[in-house]
Each structure stands twice: as C-alpha cells, then as structure tokens.
A protein has these predicted regions:
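Proteolytic maturation boundary segments
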Residues: 19-42, 235-323, 327-329, 388-392, ...
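Active-site His/Glu-centered metal-binding helix of metallohydrolases
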Residues: 72-80, 314, 573
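Non-catalytic, conformational "gating/processing" segments within enzyme and secreted inhibitor domains
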Residues: 148, 155, 160-161, 213-244, ...
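M16 family metallopeptidases and their MPP-like homologs
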Residues: 41-43, 48-65, 71-73, 91-144, ...
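Metal-associated gating/positioning segment near the N- to mid-region
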Residues: 79-91
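Bacterial Sec-dependent N-terminal signal peptides
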Residues: 1-22
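Hydrophobic, small-residue-rich alpha-helical packing segments that form membrane-like cores
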Residues: 155, 160-225, 229-231, 236-244, ...
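Peptidyl-prolyl cis-trans isomerase
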Residues: 148-156, 444-448, 452, 636-642, ...
Length: 941
C-alpha cells in the first residue's frame, strides 16, 4: 500500500481546504534568526562531495541611495573585495581574492557579487571544505562583508576607474541599456525609480567624498537586512553553531533607518515612453498591464502556489499562440512573447507584459497582431485541449524535479533560500510540489483559468515602452498614435481561437526493426552495440541525473563537402528543417504533440560533421529516438514556414549595421580570414542568394547514409529497454548497407579557411554613442593536438588572465576586465589560437596596450607567476571533481575521443599535477615565436 504523508492526504481528500492551508518549509533546510535580526539558511547536500557554497544576501540596493550617493550601492559591492578587517591584503593578512584562489575558488567564476535596485548578493561558491579551516575562513569572509569592510581612501580611489570602465562596458553597443535609462523618468515620474539603476552617475562615482560611501555602508549593511546561506557537503548543526558564534556578536543599530519599499502608483491613462538610439537595429515594444503584488505575508498558503500555477498555464498557452503566428509566410512581427512578474525595476508592483519586435514597414500591423491574441485570450479564454497540453507540460516538469531531487547542485538550493529571503517565495519539497501539481491538474478547471486571464490581461493601468532606431528612413509614430494603436486593437471584435483536433502518432507505421549484430565493451565504461545498418552505438550508463538521457548521432561530412558558392545557404540548412516540423506534422502541430513529453532533438551541420542531438526523460526515450529517426529519414518541407523565416530575417536585418559591435565583428572576421567567401556575414542582400531547394538538398545529402554514423547515449539508460528501440528506430535509418541510402555524387572536401598567416595591427574608427576602444588580439601557431597541449594552453590563459586583472584592472583601473580564451583544433593542421580582448577609454588605449603585450612576453621570458600557476592547477583539479558527476562531461569526453582521437579524461589529474612552469612558458614562447599575430582595434570617432 502506498504511504502518504499527512499533507498529501489533505491534498487528496480535501481540495477546498488546500487554498487556505499554510505551507510548511522544506525541513531539509535548517533556518533561524539571531537576536540581532540576521537570518540564516543551512542545508546539507552531498551531490558535490567536499564542496559547499557560501552566500550573504542583503535586502538593500540602489533604491536606498541618496541623490549624492548615486552609484555607491554598486561601488560598495566592488569594495567588498578590496580589504576587510580579517583579509586586509597588506602583507600581514591575505586579501579575499588571493586567499580564495589559493584554495581553488576562482574570482569571477566562483567568487562574485551583484547589486540590483532592491538587493545585493555576494557569493563564494564551489569551496573545497575538506579542511575545517577553509570552511571557517569562508564564513569569516561573509562576516567581514556584513560588518567589517575597511573602505580605505586609497582603495576607493583605485576602484573609481574600474567602475567607470564597467559603465563603459555595459553601455557600449547596448542601445537598450541607454534607452532604458532615458525612459525611466517618464515611466516612474515623481518617484525614486526615476533614477535608480545600480551603475549610477559617473560624475558621482569619479568624485564622491569617501564619507558618502561609508555612510551608506553603515546605514544599510546591518544584520536585520541580511541572510547567511550555506549549502553543500557540510554538517548543518556545526555550521549553525559557527554562525551563531561568529555573527551573533554583530550589533544591531539602536536607531536603524527604516527600510522603505517605495510604491508605484496606478495610472488611469496609458503612460507612453519612447526613445530612439542610432545604434538600435529594430523597434522593440513592451506593453505592461500593472497590478498589485501579492504581499509577502500572503505567500505562505497553497492558494498562492495555485495562483502561480494558473498564471504559468496562461503564459504557456498564450506564448504557444504567438509562436504559431510566426509560422506564417509573412509573419506580422519579428518576435513576440508574454511574461508576468515585477514591473520593470520595481518589486512593489507587478505586471503582465507583451514584448514584441515590430516590422518597421508595418508597425501598426505588429501591434494589431500581438494585441489581438492577448484580447482573444482575455475575452474567450483557452480551449480544453490547450489547457490539457499546458497541464501535461507542467506535470512533466514537476515529475523531473522530483526524480532528480537528489541530483541537484548546491546552487539549486541556494536559489531557493535566496528567493525566500529576498522575495518571500515559499520553500517546499519536490515531493510536495509534485503532489500539489497533480492535485491542481485534477481540480483546476478551464473556467477558473479563463477567469484568471481577465485579471491578468487588462486594458487598464497600462504602460507602453518603445525602443526604436534613430534613422532618418524610419518614421516612429508619435506617442499618441502608438497609444491609439493599442486602444483600437483592444476595442476590436475578435473570433475565439480554434484549432484542429490532434490525431495520429509521430510514426503511424513504425519501420520493421533491424538487428544488433555485435556487442562489446568500449572506452570509458561504455557498452558498444553494432547495428545491422552500420551505425555504431556507444552507451554510457550513469546515475548523475536520474531522469535524463542525452543522445548524439553524427557522421563525417558537413558543409566542407560543398563549394564556396553554397556558403549563403549554410546558416539556413538546419533552421529550415526545424521550422518545417518533421514527418507528417508541421512545427506547431509537432509542438502540441510533444507537450506531454520531455524529449527533443535538434539537427546541426558544422564544417566537417552533421549531427542530431537531443535529451529526454527516461520515460520518453522512445519519443526521442522516434524524432531522431524522423529528422534523419523523414524531414519535412514547408515552403510557407521557410519563406516566413526569410521574410522575418530580412526585416530584422534592415538596420543590422546600426550597432558598432556588428560592424566591428564583420571587420574582425574579414581581417582574420581574408574576406573568405565561407566566412561572410548574413546580410539582407545575402538572402537573395538563399535557395530553399538547395538548402533541402544539402540537408538530405548530409543525412542520406547512416552506415558510418556513430551514436552516443549518456545517462540513466536501461540497456535492456534500449535494445529494441535501437533496432526499431536507429538500425532502420537509411544506409548503403541495407540499400536504402541515396548517395550524392561528386563530393569533394572544400577546406575551411584558417586564420591568415600575418603579423599586423589594424585600427579603424567608428561613431559610437558611448566612447570606447575595443581591442582583440589573436595569436595563432601550430601545436600538436594533445591533452597536454590543451592543458598547457588552459593554464596559460588562466595565469595571463590573473596577470591582466592585477595590472590592467586593479593597478591602472583601465578596464572592467581583460578576457583571455583559447582554441585547439586539428581541422586542416593542428592549430592553437589565443585571443585577448578588452574595452577601455580611447584615451587609455595607448597606455594599456603595451601592458597587455608585456605580460605575455614576461611569461615567455621568465615563466608564469608561481602563485598564479598553483591557483590555476588547484582550480582545475577542483572542477574536475565537479565535472565527472555530470552527463555533459562524459558526452564531451567520449565524443572527442571517438571523433578526434584525443582522451581528455584518462590521467587528467596526474597531467595537471605534472604540468610545469616550463611547459606553460614554452607554450607562450611558441606562441610569440610564430609571429602570427593580428590585432584589430575599433575606436570611437
């Protein structure tokens, strides 16, 4: 007999009591509040052995700044990494960043923070806590962030430049960010939200008195507004005792300032806020319908979760309708979606939002089409079949969350605690949630959902925000005209939504099965099955995610078998297929048929391979293999869908070059590859050379013969259940071995271009709304394609990144960050590439560039900094332990060994330990000795 907990019995027996029933917090969390008001959440999680995450969350943000402090909430976040009482960085005690990196916690990846309008959160993630001293030190950092920042004059002045460069990075090439800053005074007129974005005023950042920052810290960083969150392989009771001892001594201010949550007023007439920017490529519209938030104290009942459930169904169904419209031959908009949540930047007001990209030649038509669907839903609701699909999908998500409840990484539970502390969202178990969804699916009716639609979607309390290109050829309708577009569309008469009844199976008549002709043990613990049509299947059984199976089916070929003249078609080959649906079903029908399934497959074609990749739940493995069969053997043509996609793309590309970043990227690729025809960007004129017939032919030829294809399955696979499915859906793929393949003729490999052999610097200027210099430096050199070479490159880019952080960011305050990345390939010849990227003030470019080159030369001449190299190796060893319990890692390792002949797994830890400074130095030396360096810089005029 199935055993139910009391709350489950309540759900099953008394639906009318559920709505008012108080929720019990997930008992796996140890929570409490100290006398000084500090809240804590502690949870044991053994998924990542020896690893824990440490967070401090603050219910404070930029909305609490005084006018003279604009930007200081965010500035303070930066200062938390620049000196605290116990981590001074003065030679007597280490600074926070060096200490964390000495134990394998990487700045940026594991050690970070963010500031928003109403909250500030700091994290030390993926901390190896095998030694108690490390755990104690992580808690001590949280303690210092809470109460003991030094905020010295010297460090404040050093950070001003870094903040200014972050402002430059966030605004450069991001027109919507700039326009949002400009529309907020209209949207929030008369409130603190008019000017509240965290980056603040650069005039204040550059010049504020030190006292203003210290005043903000003293006033708002206090225990009654803070929470400590610790999740991972720890003993909760012991951590709780440490928190009480360490944080309990922090005093609570006697006359603490009131933490005000500023309200947002309703509006009778629509507020219209428009803005234009010369770097904005398309017209974006956001129509908000404001409504009151649920008070935090009312989020503790089952009724609150039921309301959220109904809202999620409404959004799912409405977005499905909007997606259908995009399949038309001439789609009425570029994109459209529906959302619900906080109104813009304010947590004190919620809103339903319609977000859509307008066709510039028919702005009114875009408004009409999007609002028509929201009005249709508001007036007539949704059909029973739509509701059933949405409920099925919601149940599948809950079932997966329950099945994988013990497979969750630490951040999953951290986010639960954060949402509870910052937004009062309830923390419930996956078992409770699953039973709740099942009960909602049984008891929530279409009438209830359709009543809720009328509350969510309204013609009152509306705000329209429009971002548009600032181009002479584009005429933006006046604000009153845009308002009239909305009101007229909301006043029209509409017919109810209707759809044909779904019938049939994905594959009405399954193919007669093939056979398994051989089985053997394979690499990395795989089982290898040879199929009768020549496909070789590798199965890696894992229990890392209880309800996940991933597949990959690939073969040699790709676009390199087609001439340069076909290059305009390449970007559309796979999208043309997926936009058409598959088998007998168009894309919209296929989406509906898969609503109750957790399965999907996507084709892709690269330079040298064609692949089908997908994921599914354990129960839906059959569906995933059916889709694999259909995309290989029975792709679908849909001229209307293809023409619609091309038409939408043509409209989207109208102002493609408006963004300077696009022009820069085009120039970058042209310089690197010498304007090679296979490396050309897609522009409006390119679309005229795209042929659907040719796109279809390329796809069919790439997936014509499975005889030399390889399949890899990774996950919770039942091999006995898998065998008949492989015979039915994989062994029957067209193949020269079973005489079902249609072989293309005259195939010849056309090599993909390499980066040019050159040593040169290119600089050009372009008008930008945010002055900046954007620099990319590429080094290419021949390097053996081995695991050791890959590791040496990895460590080189990490120690170089550290050197740049110290010299360019911290010492000079010259950039928000220098990015270093690498590639190692064996396509035409084994080649390595190192890429260095940064953005800065044009006035600082000449000063910073020599430093960038000098740091690399220093490593080539003298070797890497020993401390930096030790930190990089510790980080790699730590992440290796995290990676090997992930299905994606095994998919990557096995695929690359089968495809490229390189084993990234075996002996990796020893390889890391044995890597020497001389190995890294030699890699840097080889890189410089190649004399193949291309620098491309774009400066503002």
């Amino acid at each position: 007999m199935k055993k139910y907990f009391p709350w489950v019995l309540l759900l099953l027996l008394s639906p009318t009591l559920v709505v008012a029933q108080a929720l019990e917090q997930d008992p796996s969390f140890l929570t409490g509040k100290l006398k000084n008001g500090l809240t804590y959440y502690i949870r044991h999680n053994a998924k990542e052995p020896g690893i824990a995450d440490f967070y401090i969350a603050q219910r404070v943000g930029s909305i609490l700044e005084e006018p003279r402090q604009r930007g200081l909430a965010h500035f303070l976040e930066h200062m938390a990494f620049n000196g605290t009482t116990h981590f001074r960085g003065d030679g007597k005690s280490p600074a926070i960043v060096p200490w964390c990196e000495s134990v394998g916690v990487k700045f940026g990846a594991n050690l970070n923070a963010y500031t928003s309008v109403d909250q500030t959160v700091y994290n030390i993630s993926a901390v190896p806590v095998g030694r108690e001293a490390v755990l104690d030190s992580a808690l001590l950092i949280l303690h210092d962030w809470s109460h003991d920042l030094l905020l010295t004059d010297k460090e404040i002045d050093k950070e001003r430049g870094v903040i200014h460069e972050e402002w430059r990075t966030r605004r450069a090439g991001k027109a919507t960010q700039r326009m949002m800053e400009r529309v907020l005074p209209t949207v929030y007129r008369g409130t603190k939200y008019e000017d509240c974005l965290p980056i603040g005023s650069m005039d204040i950042v550059d010049n504020f008195p030190y006292k203003d920052l210290r005043d903000y810290y003293k006033k708002w960083y206090r225990p009654d507004l803070q929470a400590i969150i610790v999740v991972g392989d720890i003993r909760p009771a012991e951590v709780e005792a440490k928190i009480k001892r360490l944080f309990g001594a922090i005093p609570r201010p006697k006359r603490a300032a009131e933490r005000v949550y500023y309200p947002v007023a309703d509006n009778d007439r629509m507020i219209v806020a428009t803005d234009r920017d010369s770097e904005q490529p398309i017209m974006l519209a956001n129509l908000y319908m404001k409504h009151d938030v649920v008070p935090d104290g009312e989020k503790t009942t089952v009724g609150y979760l039921r309301d959220n459930y109904i809202e999620s169904l409404i959004l799912s169904m409405l977005n499905a309708r909007l997606q259908e419209l995009q399949q038309q031959a001439v789609p009425p908009f570029l994109s459209a979606s529906a959302h619900a949540g906080p109104f813009l930047v304010s947590r004190t007001k919620d809103a339903f939002r319609l977000s859509f990209g307008c066709r510039q030649e028919n702005v009114k038509g875009s408004f009409d089409a999007v609002i028509a669907e929201s009005e249709r839903a508001r007036r007539y609701g949704f059909t029973e079949s739509e509701l059933q699909r949405a409920q099925d999908r919601r149940l599948k998500v809950a079932e997966r969350q329950y099945a994988e409840r013990n497979d969750r990484r630490n951040h999953y539970f951290v986010n639960k605690a954060l949402q509870n502390f910052l937004s009062a969202e309830p923390v419930v178990t996956e078992a409770f949630q699953l039973e709740l969804i099942r009960q909602f699916n049984r008891t929530v009716t279409s009438e209830q959902v359709n009543r809720a639609v009328k509350s969510l979607i309204s013609d009152r309390n509306q705000v329209l925000v429009v971002y548009a290109p600032d181009k002479p050829e584009f005429v933006l309708p006046p604000d009153d005209t845009l308002e009239r577009y909305v009101l007229d569309a909301q006043a029209r008469t509409y017919e109810p939504y209707s759809e044909p009844q779904l019938t049939g199976e994905l594959i009405p008549t399954p193919p007669q099965p093939g056979t398994i002709v051989g089985e053997r043990a394979g690499l990395h613990g795989t089982k290898v099955l040879e199929l009768s049509n020549g496909v070789t299947v590798y199965v890696k059984q894992t229990d890392h995610s209880k309800d996940q199976i991933a597949i990959r089916l690939w073969g040699e070929g790709g676009t390199s078998r087609y001439p340069d003249s076909d290059a305009p078609n390449f970007p559309f080959v796979t999208s043309a297929i997926t936009d058409a649906g598959v088998g007998a079903f168009d894309k919209n029908t296929l989406h509906k048929m898969l609503a109750s399934k957790m399965a999907g497959v996507t084709p892709s074609i690269s330079d040298d391979t064609q692949q089908l990749a997908g994921k599914s739940s354990v129960k839906d493995l059959k569906t995933m293999l059916e889709l694999t069969y259909l995309y290989f053997a029975q792709p679908r043509r849909d001229t209307i869908a293809f023409n619609g996609a091309i038409d939408r793309m043509r409209s989207f590309l109208t102002n493609r070059e408006a963004n300077p970043q696009v022009s820069y990227n085009d120039s970058l690729v042209a310089i690197l590859y010498g304007n090679h025809p296979r490396m050309q960007p897609t522009k409006r004129e390119t679309l005229d050379r795209v042929s659907y017939d040719r796109v279809w032919q390329i796809y069919r030829e790439c997936f014509a013969d499975a005889s030399k294809f390889t399949m890899l399955l990774v996950g919770n696979v039942d091999i006995d259940a898998l065998r008949p499915l492989l015979c039915r859906y994989v062994a029957t793929l067209p193949s020269s071995k079973n005489n079902t393949a249609t072989q293309p003729t005259g195939w010849k490999k056309h090599p993909t271009p390499d980066v040019r052999d050159a040593d040169e610097t290119r600089l050009f200027k372009k008008r930008m709304n945010t002055p900046s210099a954007l620099v990319n430096i590429f080094y290419t050199f021949e390097e053996p394609y081995t695991a050791k070479s890959d590791l040496a490159l990895d460590v080189l880019q990490r120690v170089l990144q550290t050197a740049y952080t110290d010299s360019v960011r911290e010492e000079k305050g010259g950039t928000y960050g220098v990015s270093v990345s690498y590639e190692l390939e064996k396509d035409n010849r084994p080649t390595a590439m190192l890429r260095i990227t940064f953005r800065t003030d044009p006035a600082k470019y000449a000063t910073l560039k020599p430093i960038v080159y000098r740091q690399l030369a220093h490593i080539a001449e003298r070797g890497p900094n020993p401390a930096s190299m030790d930190k990089a190796k510790k980080y790699l060893l730590k992440t290796y332990g995290q990676n090997i319990i992930d299905n994606g890692y095994w998919d990557y390792v096995i695929y690359h060994q089968l495809q490229d002949g390189i084993d990234f797994h075996t002996g990796y830890e020893q390889l890391v330990r044995n890597l020497t400074a001389r190995d890294v130095q030699q890699m840097a030396k080889d890189l410089l000795d190649s004399r193949r360096r291309i620098e491309v810089t774009m400066q503002s005029e």
